[in-house]
Amino acid sequence: MMTTRAKISLKPGSLLLCGLAGASGQSASLGREMTVAHNVVRSRVGVAPLTWSSRLADRAQEWADHLAARHQFQHSPNSPYGENLFEIDGGSATPAEVVADWASEARDYDYRTNQCRGVCGHYTQIVWRGTKEVGCAMARDGRREIWVCEYDPPGNIIGRRPY
């Protein structure tokens, strides 16, 4: 069985107004695991921990369900939140693995110049100092898992450093 992973990537310098959303319909352990995984990454750069938002989780679940039902993988249009997406085909992922994949983009972020070499928008959203809440959810589409996290307030504002 072949497993592929995909994630939405941003062009360097693009404005990402997105966030993490979580679903209250999913297990409480998903919320705990996602929050812990995000906060481990944030602690590495001295940023305050996020709190879990059932409101954002519900919104994330709605969007994940929408993507799964329509066999799509794209950001929610006109969202007032920050948003990270993750997709795995032919396998499954844990919350820690999803966040670790996004966080691996840290290697492409240069704090000194505030520039990305490649993709780093998922990472910078996770560590965005102004973001206070996160909510995440997952939906299945046959062989695919689609993960959505919503963040409030959103990060990735052009010209500003994440922390």
Regions found by a protein language model. Give the residues of each.
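Positively charged, low-complexity intrinsically disordered regions
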Residues: 6, 43, 161-162
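Hydrophobic h-region of N-terminal signal peptides that target proteins for export
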Residues: 15-23
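Acyl-group handling in specialized metabolite and lipid biosynthesis
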Residues: 85
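Short, well-ordered surface patches within globular domains
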Residues: 22-82
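Bacterial N-terminal signal peptides that target proteins for export
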Residues: 3-13
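Disulfide-stabilized extracellular recognition modules
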Residues: 78, 91-163
